[in-house]
Amino acid sequence: MQFSCRRFSIRNVLACCIVALPMPELPAPTFQNGPTLSQADLVADFDGWIAGMRALNPDLSIRVDMQVFERESARIRAALTGSMSRREAWLHFAQLNPHLRDAHAGIQIPNYRGALDEHLKTGGHVVPIEVRFASDGSLRVFTVAPGVEGVNPGDRLVSINGHGTDQMLAAMLSRAVGDTSAFQRAFVARRFAMFYWYLYGDTGQYDLVVEPARGSSPRQVRATGATTLPAALQPQRSAEDMFSWRILPGDIGYLRVDGFDGDKKDALAKVTQTAFAAFKARNARALIIDVRENSGGDDPLWQQDLVNHFTTKPYAQLSHYVIRITKDNADPGDVIGAVQSSDYDKRFTPPSVDPVRYSGPVYILAGPYSYSATIQFLVAAQDFHLAKIAGEETAAFSCQTGQVKRIDLPKSGLSAATPIIAYTRPSGEGCKRGVLPDVPIAINEVTPSETLDALDHWIREQS
């Protein structure tokens, strides 16, 4: 399944014309197609995916427009008329992903991070830029691979190998998971190299057309592909990459936490012990906890390694839940497959004594990629007045889902999943919206330092 310049917006016509300038022809793209699947196998796995969601999800209608779900499921299934490679099957099945309105639900290539990593280790390449969406909706260069000249952060991306930006985004966003279109954009931006590889393949070298950020004619650059993966696509990120802290101008403490991964528990505990001890010793004016790049993980990490260090107030991250009973969570007397709905009135109480506890004002800076356990952290902090939330309305819904279960698809080996629990935030309100900020600060995804500087400036103006 390949794509070419077929959409005729002015931007894409410009891109196609520029790329048509005389240059040596690029190599044919190479793909990791995987095994070929028969029509019967494709239908069996698609039906298995749909049946698995119905059997495990406690209530699809909490997120999903069921009429759209039924229509799109039928359309995708009806188009399974012949054999496909596993890559093509994913591209086809994944058209249902956006309609699930939940980044905990959907279908992916199995272990795509590992597959990309192996591709690079065996001499392959990925696109030599990372991208982010600007506030005007344009796709901008975020970082550039070493050795690439003529392309700079902030440049507007026009095309890659003749594929116009509008065309690429239409193909990628129509297969992206996520609660909202804003989250889907954040998801695609951070996995742009993965989407590009599965849609358009690897050509080793890439023809990039960009418009400089400071306004001049579009320019075309041929560059060798990158040989390292963006942070969000690395199979195993280091603790040094995920966590950092420092003191900002004006004696404001800053702690960046890019994940609540269970395997980083000890590393996070070590960093936060050191950071909070420094913030306390410095008598910092305020503390910023930056979770803009944190897509979640395990709740105990933010509870024990963050909240315990800045409050003694009891709190919770939910007030109600709906859960599907499975053999893994059943209590004696529960019926497997039944759905239970219950209020939640338990509270987590931080220890009364914490040698490194910080007692000043705390601001949690969120962004469009903040998700899952990070949203749970935000709503607990906001609804129990533990800290103030800064930024814009989150792209993820304030009432999250969780306890994600895998749906076995034995024919294709594709990776499908769905959550078995849906939470209501502590306030019981606002489930159809993101988390609304207490301190509105414009989010600049292209130049993230500007957002942090703006919050730092706002805090200093308050005292």
Regions found by a protein language model. Name each.
Residues 12-22:
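Bacterial N-terminal signal peptides
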Residues 2, 22-24:
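Position-driven detector of the extreme protein N-terminus
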Residues 1-2, 116:
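Compositionally biased, intrinsically disordered low-complexity regions used as flexible
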Residues 3-14:
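Bacterial N-terminal signal peptides that target proteins for export
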Residues 26-287, 291-304, 308-322, 398, ...:
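Flexible, low-complexity junctional segments that flank or bridge functional domains
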Residues 299-451, 457-458:
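Conserved acidic, small-residue-rich alpha-beta core segments centered on
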Residues 6, 17-18, 432:
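Secreted/luminal cysteine- and crosslink-motif detector
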